[in-house]
Regions:
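Long, contiguous binding/interaction regions
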Residues: 18, 22-48, 54, 58-91, ...
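Acidic, Ala/Val/Gly-enriched low-complexity intrinsically disordered segments
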Residues: 11-12
Length: 205
């Protein structure tokens, strides 16, 4: 797991500094034409898909997956990774990506051809799945604003995980749309910081 955590620092250079992974800002060298150039005449067909990718938990694997996306200009909306099979040294990477149906199929095909990849599942189309994301929110405020933030948190079933005289830190788990909605509600109530894990997902049997 330490190996993948080390690799994850590579992602932070592109993702957690407010930059979206796309052909515009992580394209490397003279890589081939962005896949998103292919969609210019089909912008109304852009879809969002959640992919579950099973890989070896070894040095360099995550960097290779990220390199595939950046080199081809594929977009990453969210990425999470963790070991799930300790004895087999395998990890699951959950990627939320966007593109036309053609681009999505191309992404899955190219991931499937990578040597350290054992399995690629498109959870968006392979039957029902369960998706969740965890986020923590720091909200600053006093008096009525503070009380209003607490009432909003109760509506969304957010937990208070830390509090000071002038702040609350809330924890919320749910679909990304729920996280987004709670963030919008908290903005006028003193929202200062958000930290999000990204989407994790499993196929329902």
């Amino acid at each position: 797991m330490l190996q993948l955590k080390t690799q994850f620092l590579l992602v932070e250079q592109y993702w957690f500094k407010g930059k979206k992974m796309s052909a515009l800002n992580i394209k490397q060298g003279t890589s081939s034409q962005s896949a998103y150039d292919l969609r210019s005449s089909h912008s109304d067909n852009i879809e969002t898909h959640t992919l579950a990718v099973v890989v070896d938990n070894e040095a360099g694997v995550l960097a290779r997956v990220i390199g595939l996306f950046s080199g081809r200009g594929y977009n990453i909306e969210s990425l999470t990774v963790a070991e799930f099979d300790h004895e087999g040294h395998r990890s699951r990477i959950t990627i939320v990506t966007t593109g036309t149906p053609r681009v999505i199929e191309q992404i899955k095909a190219e991931l499937g051809r990578m040597v350290p990849v054992y399995q690629v599942n498109d959870l968006t189309v392979e039957g029902p799945s369960v998706e969740r994301e965890l986020a923590i929110f720091k909200v600053m405020g006093l008096g009525e604003i503070r009380a209003e933030a607490m009432r909003a948190a109760e509506i969304y079933r957010a937990k208070v995980v830390d509090s000071t005289i002038d702040s609350y830190t809330f924890e919320l788990t749910g679909k990304s749309t729920k996280i987004d909605a709670f963030a919008e509600m908290m903005r006028p109530l003193g929202l200062k910081e958000i930290a999000r894990t990204g989407v994790i997902a499993l196929k329902r049997e």
